[in-house]
Amino acid sequence: MSKPKVGINGFGRIGRLVLRAAVEKDTVDVVAVNDPFINIDYMVYMFKYDSTHGRFKGSVSAEGGKLIVTNGKTTHHISVHNSKDPAEIPWGVDGAEYVVESTGVFTTTDKASAHLKGGAKKVIISAPSADAPMFVMGVNNDMYDKANNHIISNASCTTNCLAPLAKVIHDKFGIIEGLMTTVHATTATQKTVDGPSGKLWRDGRGAGQNIIPASTGAAKAVGKVIPGLNGKLTGMANRVPTPDVSVVDLTCRLQKGATMDEIKAAVKEAANGPMKGILEYTEDQVVSTDFTGDTHSSIFDSLACISLNPNFVKLIAWYDNEYGYSNRVVDLISYIASR
């Protein structure tokens, strides 16, 4: 079977790392990139050098109006466009059937469907969506309906971390209710120094100077991908001055009491079985930078978890909110292409 042909709209943090993941995994063929604000020479530079993930381990160049990206094993010849209107991007001409919508702007079904006018067959939004169906690999991807799901969402990086863990715990022990906190790395929407920020004044404070309490819909979104948890989870974020890697703290009440050893055994079994590659299990004394570049959605930290009693537990899981998530975008494309 030929590799799915992919277009990327928006060459920001996620757009560039989806391309890196695509080259590394060699399961999809990226044939086009669109970004109205970045010309091709600047794309070469931004893809080659990355302050968080280091230099690209391969070569990238601009030749004849195309990005040529290779890691020695596979070469991607990528058409470059600079259109502001998604409907005007000629995905069909480039052969891009699957479009990654990673601008952060076109996150509704209506807005993202503009890509279909240019010849795309499916659109994968790399963010939560108000109305597009959300799929989390390892959790509910089997609910994908090829005939009807043309605009889909890969949910958020935090939902991708929380949902696999919540599924394992809920399936085995039953979650009555839970609160999630993500200690989350800085992202591009934050300010380097204090500045204006609409109604959410705290969000406008300097990212490098503060721990900033913030909202997140990640926990509630788990209820959309695991219907049995709908209305049982909510959460918040604390934004911290680190460039990448975040950590989820899920504090929940269990229906069926369990020792921490029983919980660890259940997670380890899933990590080595049905969720291999999605969920990871560690018994090492790790810190955040140990997971920069980790491709898993969720890494369960067995040493950091605690319980008050068999029915009330705090569970900890790490995630590279950039690269782990970008790998799932590529995996989701591979999955829907195989249906």
Curated annotation (Swiss-Prot):
Subcellular compartments: Cytoplasm
Positions that bind D-glyceraldehyde 3-phosphate: 156-158, 187, 216-217, 239
Molecular function GO terms recorded: glyceraldehyde-3-phosphate dehydrogenase (NAD+) (phosphorylating) activity; NAD binding; NADP binding
Family membership: Belongs to the glyceraldehyde-3-phosphate dehydrogenase family.
Gene responsible for this protein: G3PD
TM regions (residue ranges): none
Organism: Brugia malayi
Active site: 157
Protein's name according to its UniProt entry: Glyceraldehyde-3-phosphate dehydrogenase
GO terms under biological process: glucose metabolic process; glycolytic process
Main location: cytoplasm
